[in-house]
C-alpha cells in the first residue's frame, strides 16, 4: 500500500489542528495523524525551570531526523513507535504511540515545511494561516484550557520566542506550500472537503 502523505503547517494557533481534524473526519479509518510536536527533543538533563525557557519554535528544538525516518518507514508499510510529548513537563514522556501505516498520513506542525527532507516526502503541502491577533487569542485559550499553562507564561513565551520565530521560520514556509488555507477568510471544512 502506497500512502499519501499530507503535510499541514502554519503558525501557532492558525487552525492547523482544526483543519487536520476535518481531514481526519473526512478520511475516517483510512487516515493516521502524526504531530511534529511529538518529536521535540528530550530535555531530561535540563531542570524544569530551564525547560520552560527553551525556544520550542526553532527548528533545532525538533528531532526532525527521526520524523523523516518514521515517514519513510510508514511509506514502506512499516509500523513506527512515535514519541509522545508532554506539554505539562516541557519534555518527551516515556510513552510511545504505535502507529501503523494507512492510505492517508496527515503530518501536522508549525515547522513542518521548514525542512526540505520533510517537504520531499509530502505529496500535498498545506499552509494554514490566520491573522496574528486571532492566532495569539487561540493560543492563549488552548494553552490555558488544554495544557494547564498560566497566562503570564504564555504571553512571555509568545513575545520572546513564538512571535519572532514565526516571522523568521514559520511564515516564510508559506511559499513552499501547494495550498494556503486562510482561517480568517475561508471556511476550512470546505477546503478540506475539496482536497
Where are these regions (language model features)?
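Conserved lysine of the Walker
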Residues: 16
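ATP-dependent NMP and nucleoside kinases share a basic, alpha-helical "lid"
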Residues: 94-145
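Hydrophobic positions on the alpha1 helix immediately C-terminal to the Walker A/P-loop
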Residues: 19
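Conserved small/polar residues in nucleotide/adenosyl-binding loops
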Residues: 184-191
